Amino acid sequence: MPQDTNTALFKVIPQQLPEAEDGLEAIFELVAAGLYSLASMLLGEGEESVRLVEEAVANAEVSVCQDPQVARESSRRDLCAAALKVLAQRDPESLAAPAGLAPASVCIEEDDLASAGISSEELEGMIAGPERDRVREWLESLPTWIRVVFVLRAVAGFSAAETAALLRTHGGPDAAAWTPDAAREVFRQGLCSLASQLLQASAAR
């Protein structure tokens, strides 16, 4: 099994953080903007995603720690945990660990974005740029459990072990059997689907 890789599609807060004199308001805005994009990929756009972002930012206690990195990590994890709970409430079986999952013969051998023929910067540009709607339509076409694993790994930047732990802890009883190996294999399936989409888009040009 390939070693785990932490392939964040984009950072929840952009690398260029505001100077201290810019105040905490700018930090809140940066945190919230990245978190909403993440929430909408997990839950869809709308009031529910907005609510989870507000709660995650509040729980990050930015005003206390005044550390953007700590705020980013805390709010990102809080939001993903809350989103998993919402998904489990919507459909308890949607986050169930796939039974009897074994390494399949798919087009991607490694569990990283490079194996799909795209860099994290390129995919970040697709999500934020003109290809945004097409990328989101592709994500929405995936089964919930594949979409969630893909977003947690590629977008939020969690490792396979962290992804499995989040699903077990917050995905409801049906998600109790998730393992790091299962998260790796499902992520590979998502990467294979992404590679197929990229090939189709390239052929259509």
What residue ranges belong to the model's regions?
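Sigma70-family region 2
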Residues: 16-18, 53-74, 91-94
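Arg/Lys-rich amphipathic alpha helix in sigma70-family domain 2
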Residues: 68-70, 79-114
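DNA-recognition helix of helix-turn-helix
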Residues: 161, 165-205
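Short, small-hydrophobic-rich alpha-helical interface motif
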Residues: 31, 35, 39, 52-61, ...
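Short amphipathic alpha-helical boundary/capping segments
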Residues: 12-14, 122-127, 133-142, 194-201
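Short, aromatic/basic-enriched loop-to-helix "N-cap" motif that marks the start
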Residues: 47-51, 63-82, 176-180
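A short, charge-rich alpha-helical start-of-domain segment used by transcription regulators
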Residues: 2-37, 47, 61
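Short amphipathic alpha helix immediately N-terminal
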Residues: 137-166
